[in-house]
Amino acid sequence: MPGVYGGDEINALVIDAGHSSSRVGWAGEDAPRVVLPSYYGHTSITDDAIAELESQAAFATSSSSTVEPTERAEPVDGDETMADGQALSTSNGNGGAAATQEASDHRLRQARAKSASKTLRFSVDREKKRRRFVGDNELNLYRTNLEIAPIFDDDGMLADASAFAQLCSFGLDSLSCDASEHPLLLTEPAWNSRESREKLTELAFETLGSPAFYLANRSVLSSFAAGKPSSLVIDVGSTNVSTIPIVDGFILRKGIYRHNNGGEAINRALLYSLHHGRGATFAGVTPQYVIKSRSSVDPGTPANVVLRQERVQGASSSFRSYHINRVVNDFKESVAQVLEVPWDDQQAQFRSGRMYEFPDGYNDAFGVERLRAAEVLFTPALWNGVSSSESFGAVLHASSQPSSEAGAVNGGSVSAAGATSVAGGKAAIGLADMVLSSINAVDVDSRPSLYGNIVLVGGSSLIQGLSDRLSYELGVKAPNQKIKIHSPGNTTERRHSSWLGASILASLGTFHQLWISKQEYEEHGAAIVHARCK
């Protein structure tokens, strides 16, 4: 029998982890408390450093049975007055100061021991002799040869379970909660593998120590957050665009369509356009960490910037790529827009430009390039045959490149070596065609309901004009259908829709009988997730 939990007394934790970012918070709240990048940094660690951490962590064990110096025996009967007098006398002398200092040192050593113990448990990979770092502050801090890697692969499935466990622990620490005291709800993509589902289940019970667990589908949660039991969920994420039909709360898997031309494909298109459309005035995207100083310049003129050459030489390619992608992503969110009608060069030329300033001081009004890049979603054929470097580091400020990377930028063109198609390959189809293909793949009786309940979510769906363009194209391609697109105007609701749906679900009293309990996990193993979480 499944474990039954009361809805009123349980305060569940919700973690919604995507390829780009992960959201952590409490069930029943209307926004996540913590949003973290779904990446981790790692550097090598020596045996001596590991031994030092073990030495610090050992203090927690050795001191657990030791009475803290500040503790004293409780006064008995009428001795309270005498004890208070002695304490006052001692505090006024050197003995009191020494005792206070000793207690302070003891607490400091305990805190360090606890931190070292957690570092050894979550952050240190003894086999590969490396230490991991998670969180915005750690990933933004420059370290020589720090590598940055994604926790999830391009399909949104778990790539590094140890790094994800560390990310979850970091997020839960930010909430100041003990994971062993709260049920945990995790989310997953509709195409998640059996192996990945079992890894997540093991992580919840074995690593985090959760008393109960549930794995919910991200698309169903987005539909639930929109208040629709049946809908077509369009998720424009960082690496994938997917259209998923949901009828009465169940995914119709034969109607799932997805392509890898998501937000990062738009970033690649923007980067390509900048380097091929700006000319000599634009020398490259310069991340913040290499800038020593800069001066203001007029719009459209080259940046006047002094770089930290030791950081240019000392940064790894993955660290450089990560930070250049952050700059390009901010550029996209600030200026990118979708043309309201199918792509037309003349119409794009007449649209007004939008000002943007890069970290190195280069600024200008950007016009056609900010419109053309978003066509990756609707007209991917426009970008067929155009390659952009897989590593954003290939287009770092040209003047800062070490000689070994000089071939990456040659005469203003991006090298095709190690390149990937901007639009995710020739097989990609436009977003409107994906919607029609998904709906046509389901039963005829369900189609009208899906046309009238299209839910648009995902961080990259916030690009201006995307919803209007999709509505226009669907109206042209399916003129006899009543089409209604639900796209929340609230940024939080659209960007974090699956987390919000999970928050609502996990707070319902009727849901708590569905949790997988620790006892059930111990009896049936991780495979129970396939039977209980469908």
Swiss-Prot record:
Pfam families referenced in this protein's UniProt entry, alphabetically: Actin
GO cellular component: a single term: SWI/SNF complex
Disordered, as annotated region: 59-116
Record keyword Secreted present: no
Residue ranges crossing the lipid bilayer per the database entry: none
Keyword Transcription regulation carried by entry: yes
PROSITE patterns the record matches: ACTINS_2
Keyword terms: Activator, Chromatin regulator, DNA damage, DNA repair, Nucleus, Transcription, Transcription regulation
SMART domains: ACTIN
GO biological process, one term: DNA repair
Domain of life: Eukaryota
InterPro entries xrefs: Actin, Actin_CS, ATPase_NBD
Family, per entry: Belongs to the actin family. ARP4 subfamily.
Subunit structure: Component of the NuA4 histone acetyltransferase complex, of the INO80 chromatin remodeling complex, and of the SWR1 chromatin remodeling complex.
PANTHER family reported in the protein's UniProt record: ACTIN
Job description of the protein: Chromatin interaction component of the NuA4 histone acetyltransferase complex which is involved in transcriptional activation of selected genes principally by acetylation of nucleosomal histone H4 and H2A. The NuA4 complex is also involved in DNA repair. Is required for NuA4 complex integrity. Component of the SWR1 complex which mediates the ATP-dependent exchange of histone H2A for the H2A variant HZT1 leading to transcriptional regulation of selected genes by chromatin remodeling. Component of the INO80 complex which remodels chromatin by shifting nucleosomes and is involved in DNA repair.
Name the UniProt record assigns to this protein: Actin-related protein 4
Lineage of the species this protein comes from: Eukaryota, Fungi, Dikarya, Basidiomycota, Ustilaginomycotina
